[in-house]
Amino acid sequence: MKLTILILLVITSFCSCGILREKYAHKAIDVLTPMIGVPVVSKIVNNAAKQLVHKIAKNQQLCMFNKDVAGWCEKSCQQSAHQKGYCHGTKCKCGIPLNYK
């Protein structure tokens, strides 16, 4: 079980780096999660892993929780639109500040 979860974390990491596409990660999750002995736990891990991969895969410029973690959002907005970059959840938007705090 520990090895299966470790492999799932590696797959998620590859997906976040862009090495592995989301649909292939989901297929790998479908193959790996039945290896967990308890069916209920297997299904929960399957759903949680797919949601995690989806959230990480749609992440833009390392925006997390409205924070520009690596400064990539600001840099890409300066290069493309010459505007300040703002993180909206996991998405980067140029010139559109958050209207909530």
Swiss-Prot record:
Record's signal peptide: 1-17
Protein name: Hg-scorpine-like-2
Functional summary from the UniProt entry: Inhibits voltage-gated potassium channels.
InterPro entries cross-referenced by the UniProt entry: Long_scorpion_toxin_alpha/beta
Subcellular location: Secreted
UniProt family annotation: Belongs to the long chain scorpion toxin family. Class 3 subfamily.
Annotated organism of origin: Hoffmannihadrurus gertschi
A GO cellular-component term linked to this record: extracellular region
Lineage of the organism: Eukaryota, Metazoa, Ecdysozoa, Arthropoda, Chelicerata
Keywords, alphabetical: Disulfide bond, Ion channel impairing toxin, Potassium channel impairing toxin, Secreted, Signal, Toxin, Voltage-gated potassium channel impairing toxin
Pfam families recorded: Scorpion_toxin_alpha-beta (PF14866)
GO MF terms, alphabetically ordered: potassium channel regulator activity; toxin activity
Disulfide cysteine pairs (residue numbers): C63-C87, C73-C92, C77-C94
Tissue: Expressed by the venom gland.
UniProt domain BetaSPN-type CS-alpha/beta: residue ranges: 60-100
